[in-house]
Each structure stands twice: as C-alpha cells, then as structure tokens.
C-alpha cells in the first residue's frame, strides 16, 4: 500500500494545479477555432443580435486572442483589431483592409440550447 502514496500525492497535486488554473466564474484563454470565427461573424455582422446598449459599430480585421467564460451559456471575449464603421452594412469582417485600426474587446453571449446569440459589449482597449 505504501507504493500508492506517491501516486495519490501526484494525482492530488495535479488536481490542485488544474483547478487553480481555472478561476471560478472567470475567463479562460482559448485557442480560436473555425467554429469560434463563425460565431463571431454570425453575431457581429447581425445588428439585430446586438444588445440595446451596444452603440459601437466596428468591423474586425483579425482576432488577436479569445477568452471564454461559462455562465448560463458561454461568454466569448474576442480580442480583435478592427475599425469603426458608419453603416450596419459594414459590420463583420472588414471589407476595407486599409482602414485605421484599433484594438477592441467584443463579448458575445451564446446559449446553444435556446439558440441565443447576443453581442453584449464592444469596448475599445486602452
């Protein structure tokens, strides 16, 4: 039985490290997948998916990184380079790749079992 102690100690240490890396209720870094890009394009290009208090209108040039947060669905925080636009027809990926870009955080809430997809915030990064 003494040979099991080191194994159990290793398993306990692994569990502790794994749980401390994920902050409860916090955001976790995530590799951007094609499905994530599809979700961003679908939500960000559709003005009817915008929460009523989201007044910023941008197109995105590229996704720099992504974080997710599990809530009653999932929050996706896309860190993007993008440009301010004047028309809802310009939302989504930037058609003009030569626009003057800035950094933004776009938060999208998704709840797959209710088909909810909502842009909850677009914030310039300072």
Swiss-Prot record:
Protein name, UniProt field: Cystatin-like cysteine protease inhibitor EPIC1
GO function term, MF aspect, one: peptidase inhibitor activity
Induction statement: Expression is up-regulated during infection of host tomato.
Alphabetized InterPro entries for the sequence: Cystatin_sf
Taxonomic superkingdom: Eukaryota
Residues the record marks as site: Reactive site: 25
GO cellular component, one term: extracellular region
Gene3D superfamilies according to UniProt: 3.10.450.10
Localization per Swiss-Prot or TrEMBL: Secreted
Keywords: Glycoprotein, Protease inhibitor, Secreted, Signal, Thiol protease inhibitor, Virulence
């Amino acid at each position: 039985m003494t040979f099991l102690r080191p194994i159990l100690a290793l398993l306990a240490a692994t569990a502790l490290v794994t749980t401390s890396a994920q902050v409860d209720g916090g955001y976790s870094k995530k590799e951007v997948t094609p499905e994530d890009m599809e979700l961003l394009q679908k939500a960000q290009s559709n003005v009817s998916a915008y929460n009523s208090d989201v007044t910023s209108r941008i197109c995105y040039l590229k996704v720099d990184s992504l974080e997710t947060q599990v809530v009653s669905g999932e929050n996706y925080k896309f860190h993007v380079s993008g440009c301010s636009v004047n028309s809802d027809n310009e939302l989504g990926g930037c058609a003009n790749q030569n626009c003057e870009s800035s950094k933004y955080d776009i938060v999208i809430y998704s709840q797959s079992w209710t088909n909810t997809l909502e842009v909850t915030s677009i914030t310039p990064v300072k």
